[in-house]
Amino acid sequence: TTLFRSPVAAGLDFEATLSEEKRVLVVDIGGGTTDCSLLLMGPQWHHRRDRENSLLGHSGCRVGGNDLDIALAFKSLMPLLGMGGQTEKGIALPILPWWNAIAINDVPAQSDFYSTANGRFLNDLVRDAQDAEKVALLYKVWRQRLSYRVVRTAEESKIALSDRPEHTVSLPFISDDLATAISQEGLETALAQPLQRILEQVQLALDNGKEKPDVIYLTGGSARSPLIKKALAEQLPGIPIAGGDDFGSVTAGLARWAQVMFR
């Protein structure tokens, strides 16, 4: 049995477009993971069954598009629900309930947020907060289990900001007039931390490979984000960035490999 790393499979689809051997950095950013592989690719590798010798370096982590959406929801949407406020006595409200509310890829965090004990805590928080109306909206998220809808709204905002400088996001499922504007600058600030972790994986793959890529092949659901392309271009200036079928490249690559293995 041969197991293929997903960026290697994704890269095989891109390899079919090459007319000469190149060092290709494949960056595959999925929903929950980022995988990076530095590979030798080209016509001379097309019909090789064993690709181990073409793999120069690899790295990966459990950060992906979902983490970008969660970060945007936390930084840009949670303040609408009272995050960063104070009690009537001037004591800062704890941040954790707002984080747990949108940490949809963290089972313990979601279990804690939707626990009965946390419901009582949020009720007390509404009573004690200076801006009780805003904190009551977080309590509504708890009561109606709205976490996924909040993060989905953040994802839609991230997508909208791919081709415009500013986007107004509304959350009518929480409150009719609840809305805010998110700018490109706000998006960059919100996504800085998970984006940095993705760039660290790129650097790890390059450190493992000990060579500079000729081209970057960016794929996966988050590959369409101009912010990610910009960050990669800044990290690796002068290296062209190519793209393909962001959602189907792994499948297409595996199909090509199957033709080699079973022809």
Can you annotate each of these PLM segments?
Residues 21-27, 56-64, 178, 182, ...:
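Alpha-helix capping and helix-loop boundary segments enriched in small/acidic/polar residues
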Residues 139-147, 176-206:
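Adenine-nucleotide phosphate-binding core of ATP-dependent small-molecule kinases
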Residues 2-3:
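Short, small-residue-biased leader/transition segments that mark boundaries at the very start
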Residues 40-173:
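Phosphate-binding glycine-rich/basic clefts of nucleotide- and phosphate-handling proteins
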Residues 7-18, 153, 157-160, 189-214, ...:
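Phosphate/ATP-binding catalytic cores across multiple sugar-kinase/actin-like superfamilies
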Residues 16-49, 218:
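Gly/Thr-rich phosphate-binding beta-strand-loop-beta motif of the actin/hexokinase/Hsp70
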Residues 6-17, 69-75, 193, 223, ...:
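Glycine-rich phosphate-binding/hydrolytic loop that grips phosphoryl groups
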Residues 142, 146-147, 213-232:
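Glycine-rich phosphate-binding loops at beta-strand->alpha-helix junctions
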